[in-house]
Amino acid sequence: MKITKITTYRLPPRWMFLKIETDEGVVGWGEPVIEGRARTVEAAVHELSDYLIGQDPSRINDLWQVMYRAGFYRGGPILMSAIAGIDQALWDIKGKVLNAPVWQLMGGLVRDKIKAYSWVGGDRPADVIDGIKTLREIGFDTFKLNGCEELGLIDNSRAVDAAVNTVAQIREAFGNQIEFGLDFHGRVSAPMAKVLIKELEPYRPLFIEEPVLAEQAEYYPKLAAQTHIPLAAGERMFSRFDFKRVLEAGGISILQPDLSHAGGITECYKIAGMAEAYDVTLAPHCPLGPIALAACLHIDFVSYNAVLQEQSMGIHYNKGAELLDFVKNKEDFSMVGGFFKPLTKPGLGVEIDEAKVIEFSKNAPDWRNPLWRHEDNSVAEW
């Protein structure tokens, strides 16, 4: 079997799908994208295709190493996202050829279900509370919400009080009937992270995500030393080499590699194993589409330390398409009591509606994250 063609499709709301075709008619799908940089990743995919056309798709490990090591410059969000989507598609092909789901090819199940959590938007506490109530009706009891709006490098007590007030009202409204993580989104400087984490501790969030930017990872162990709240990070780390430094330094309790950013299934399985050796749990980052989610689920079901799975159903970014709009076998992604079951169809287990993908790709928007500014008009982290 040989790879004959690689096609990319930019899609709403902010996704990109990839299709790998073979001379035997077996097709694999992947999801390579950096949100807001889809065209750049698309160019990288087609540059990497020179290494792939005419090659045997079953040699996933060799092809991964070629894509990573053949170029003198490597790593980073763009190249690793391109590799990630290609890697997902190669695993999809292998599973279809062998008539087995990817988790079966990786040694079989380590669990029968995985807890999912849902992102909750809203600028006011009442809006967040209403959103949680709606999601509880469909089975969720675990959530993630923004921990704050933009904060200055050193900000005032009013900004801190506003962030804490939202969390306090949520805990008061639901008590211990729900769990929630707080996403700082890298918006918070190290000095302000110290202040905010201390103020939030009485409300017992499940975790705090990206307490500071990955570029400031040296602060993770320092922040962890002052709190009992587990710290989470990883969506802006792109290879096992990035994660190696964080694991060695300590401070992070939950790793969040993104299966569409950090080298795909091949790389993230290695990252999961590294984390387990440090007694660090895994909660793959996934605010993206169905192929990315499927890839995450296969890792969850073969990784002992996987504890939570993010998913983008109903997320506020999903304008123009929802999580399962391009999927034929929607029922396979159904959750029971807030848990996903293993996908059982061969490969990734996602049946893509290719005709719909082609149609929607004709007018795909170029999504960009907002540009925020502080009161003094300097740029703020989003």
From Swiss-Prot:
Transmembrane segments: none
EC class name: lyase
Catalytic machinery residues: 185, 285
Gene3D superfamilies, alphabetized: Enolase-like C-terminal domain, Enolase-like, N-terminal domain
Pathway: Carbohydrate acid metabolism; D-galactonate degradation; D-glyceraldehyde 3-phosphate and pyruvate from D-galactonate: step 1/3
Record-linked SMART domains: MR_MLE
UniProt-listed GO biological process terms: amino acid catabolic process; D-galactonate catabolic process
Keyword Lyase set for record: yes
Residues binding Mg(2+), per UniProt: 183, 209, 235
Keyword entries, A-Z: Lyase, Magnesium, Metal-binding
InterPro entries: DgoD-like (IPR034593), Enolase-like_C_sf (IPR036849), Enolase-like_N (IPR029017), Enolase_C-like (IPR029065), Galactonate_deHydtase (IPR023592), Mandel_Rmase/mucon_lact_enz_CS (IPR018110), Mandelate_racemase_C (IPR013342), Mandelate_racemase_N_dom (IPR013341)
Positions of the record's site feature: Increases basicity of active site His: 258
Note: Reaction proceeds via an anti dehydration.
Record protein name field: D-galactonate dehydratase
Species per Swiss-Prot/TrEMBL record: Escherichia coli O1:K1 / APEC
